[in-house]
Amino acid sequence: MSITAERKAEVIKDNARDKGDTGSPEVQVAILTDRINTLTEHFKTHRKDNHSRRGLLMMVNKRRSLLDYLRKKDEGRYQALIAKLGLRK
């Protein structure tokens, strides 16, 4: 369950720090969040798809690592990102 190229380009454009930015932690977290949300919808109808569930858990762990890195490097960017993506309650 991947996202389309158009959707990915839109996510990159919305979260890029400057033009051509595709590798910053903000962009990577936003892409992972979009993929995680897509897989979450997939699991509502395919409850026993354990192969994809493993991929989901790996994505969640990767996102957690990137968020930890960003919080350590720049707290302000971290707070802005989680507010924008709605990750924390």
Curated annotation (Swiss-Prot):
Question: Known InterPro entries for this protein?
Answer: Ribosomal_uS15 (IPR000589), Ribosomal_uS15_bac-type (IPR005290), uS15_NS1_RNA-bd_sf (IPR009068)
Q: Which GO-annotated molecular functions does the record name?
A: rRNA binding; structural constituent of ribosome
According to its UniProt entry, the protein's GO biological process terms are: translation
Q: Does the keyword RNA-binding apply?
A: yes
Q: Name one Pfam family in it.
A: Ribosomal_S15
Which ranges are annotated Basic and acidic residues under compositional bias? 1-21
Q: Does the keyword Cytoplasm apply?
A: no
Gene Ontology CC annotation, any one: cytosolic small ribosomal subunit
UniProt KW keywords: Ribonucleoprotein, Ribosomal protein, RNA-binding, rRNA-binding
Per the record, which residues fall in region Disordered?
1-26
Q: What does this protein do?
A: One of the primary rRNA binding proteins, it binds directly to 16S rRNA where it helps nucleate assembly of the platform of the 30S subunit by binding and bridging several RNA helices of the 16S rRNA. Forms an intersubunit bridge (bridge B4) with the 23S rRNA of the 50S subunit in the ribosome.
The similarity annotation says: Belongs to the universal ribosomal protein uS15 family.
Assembly and interaction partners = Part of the 30S ribosomal subunit. Forms a bridge to the 50S subunit in the 70S ribosome, contacting the 23S rRNA.
- What is the protein name stated in its UniProt record? Small ribosomal subunit protein uS15
Classification lineage: Bacteria, Pseudomonadati, Pseudomonadota, Alphaproteobacteria, Sphingomonadales
Q: Which gene produces this protein? A: rpsO
